[in-house]
Structure formats: structure tokens, C-alpha cells
């Protein structure tokens, strides 16, 4: 780099507002202040007062024999590849639902029936469960389905809540690592929205690893919730992280990082800011209906 180029770099104005590094520094100071306040506040509790408060809180979470929890919570099992159902407020584990794993107790992943459900991904013996979400009608849980994604092998599975078992599974094509899954809320869960996290070359056949190439990108994915088939995919720059849909049925939005299309952490953190990508669902549907799309050989 010559002196002229160095001068140009030095003269680039800082973006307005609080920078990422400034925010982290401010957060550290704020955290120290809050910690101090908590310590001061904690000093007013005697041991007896604290014990009484803890006992009262415990009594509100106790669910006795023959009693039912008020709510059921659905947790992802992470690298276990399963979904776990827990009672709330008791926090007792009630059931484990095998999804992306092999389960000897039930035969999941071993029986012909379960292999038919798993389809072309039945040979995988592992999964990385993320983001379980319940289907909705008019913005409220309808108790019909639960959907969950597998980051390890780019899959999305559906669990029927009337039987608490996985009944459909889809391998998302043209992508690497499905991460970030949400559902259309209004008027009902027509689509399952799933981010593909990593930028990859297309076709991803090993002929190139150039992420700066125009044919290197990631995809925002919409899955037909009833058929469990791909509805559409949208080409996006940068790695997609998390996603969500609004309460009007019009928009979905995804957070993005690595707008630099870098390979390492330092490169991915180079830009001060990345972006949020907003998708207009009706316009996407209209474009597909008008034939304004391409087909990828995934």
C-alpha cells in the first residue's frame, strides 16, 4: 500500500451512531454497575428472609403426584438430534421424540417405517437440532405440528402433535447448514421459513471454492408446511443467521453476517455492520406465478 492509499484509508469517516466495539465497551461498564447494584440490593436480605422467599418460589413450581403441569415446553436436543418435552412449571422431562438420531428404544432410524419418513437422509445417524416452533392459525398456536431444523445435514422435520412423533422430513437442496427456522403465523402456517447459513458455490461440485464469484451465495428457503416440499428459494448475499415472520402474513426477515464472503473469523468481522434481509411473501409468489425464476440443479 503506498502513502496515497494509506491517506485515503485514514480519511474514511467513522459511521455515525454507536459502533459494535463501542457498544461492547459500554455493555461491560453497564454490567459492572448492575452487578454492584445487585450486591447492594442483596445485602438487605437476611438468611431467613431469603430462605422463606426461596421456599415460596419452590412451592409454586411443585407439581404433585396425579397433578398436571400448566404448560408443556418443547426443547431442541442439539447434537442429540431429538426434541424433548418438559412440563412447566415442574420442569420434569416427560418425553423424548427421536427425529434426526437413531433411537434403539423405539427403533427410530432402524425400522423400515422410520427410514421411509427420513427419506434420502436415512443413512445419516446424527443431527443438530435447532429452533423448534409450533404451527399457528391466526397468530396463535393451533397444536397441529412442530417443525425443527437440522443444521448438521440441512434438513427440516415435522412432528405431529396429536401423536408426538415425526411424520415428515425434508432435505433442503442447494444449501449448506439450515439454521434459523420460523413459521408463517397469519392466516395460518402455510410456509416454514428456513435460513441456509453458509455461502457456497453453485453448483457445489468441488470445482471451485471462490466465495467472491457471482455464483456463490446462500438461500432463504420456504417449505410447504402440509406437503413438506420446497415451495421456493431466494438468492441472498452473506451468511443468514436467524429469521422470523410478521403477524400480518406479508413479511419474513433474516439477519445476515459475513457480507464480506470471507473464510475466517477475522474476515467475517471486518465490516462494522452487515444487514437484515426482508422478504415480501406476496411479491415472491407473484414473481413465481409470472415465471420469473430459475431452476437450480440441487
State where each predicted segment sits:
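N-terminal secretory signal peptides
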Residues: 1-22, 47
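Predominantly soluble domains enriched in secretory-pathway, periplasmic, or organellar proteins
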Residues: 17-18, 27-36, 48-298
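Hydrophobic alpha-helical membrane-insertion segments, chiefly the h-region
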Residues: 36-43
Amino acid at each position: 500500500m503506498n502513502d496515497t492509499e494509506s491517506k485515503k484509508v485514514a480519511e474514511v469517516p467513522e459511521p455515525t451512531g454507536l459502533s459494535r466495539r463501542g457498544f461492547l465497551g459500554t455493555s461491560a461498564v453497564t454490567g459492572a454497575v448492575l452487578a454492584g447494584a445487585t450486591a447492594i440490593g442483596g445485602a438487605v436480605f437476611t438468611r431467613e428472609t431469603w430462605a422463606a422467599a426461596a421456599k415460596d418460589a419452590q412451592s409454586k413450581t411443585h407439581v404433585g403426584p396425579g397433578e398436571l403441569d400448566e404448560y408443556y415446553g418443547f426443547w431442541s436436543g442439539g447434537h442429540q438430534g431429538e426434541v424433548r418435552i418438559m412440563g412447566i412449571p415442574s420442569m420434569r422431562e416427560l418425553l423424548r421424540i427421536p427425529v434426526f438420531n437413531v433411537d434403539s428404544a423405539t427403533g427410530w432410524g432402524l425400522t423400515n417405517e422410520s427410514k421411509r419418513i427420513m427419506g434420502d437422509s436415512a443413512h445419516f445417524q446424527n443431527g443438530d437440532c435447532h429452533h423448534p416452533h409450533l404451527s399457528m392459525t391466526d397468530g396463535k398456536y393451533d397444536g397441529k405440528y412442530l417443525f425443527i431444523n437440522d443444521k448438521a445435514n440441512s434438513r427440516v422435520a415435522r412432528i405431529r402433535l396429536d401423536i408426538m412423533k415425526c411424520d415428515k422430513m425434508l432435505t433442503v437442496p442447494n444449501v449448506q447448514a439450515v439454521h434459523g427456522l420460523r413459521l408463517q403465523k397469519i392466516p395460518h402456517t402455510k410456509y416454514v421459513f428456513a435460513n441456509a447459513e453458509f455461502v457456497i458455490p453453485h453448483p457445489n461440485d468441488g470445482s471451485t471454492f471462490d466465495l467472491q464469484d457471482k455464483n456463490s451465495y446462500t438461500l432463504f428457503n420456504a417449505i410447504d408446511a402440509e406437503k413438506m416440499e420446497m415451495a421456493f428459494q431466494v438468492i441472498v448475499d452473506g451468511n443468514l443467521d436467524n429469521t422470523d415472520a410478521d403477524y400480518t402474513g406479508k413479511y419474513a426477515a433474516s439477519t445476515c453476517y459475513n457480507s464480506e464472503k470471507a473464510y475466517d473469523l477475522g474476515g467475517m468481522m471486518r465490516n462494522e455492520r452487515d444487514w437484515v434481509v426482508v422478504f415480501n411473501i406476496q411479491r415472491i409468489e407473484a414473481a413465481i406465478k409470472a415465471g420469473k425464476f430459475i431452476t437450480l440443479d440441487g
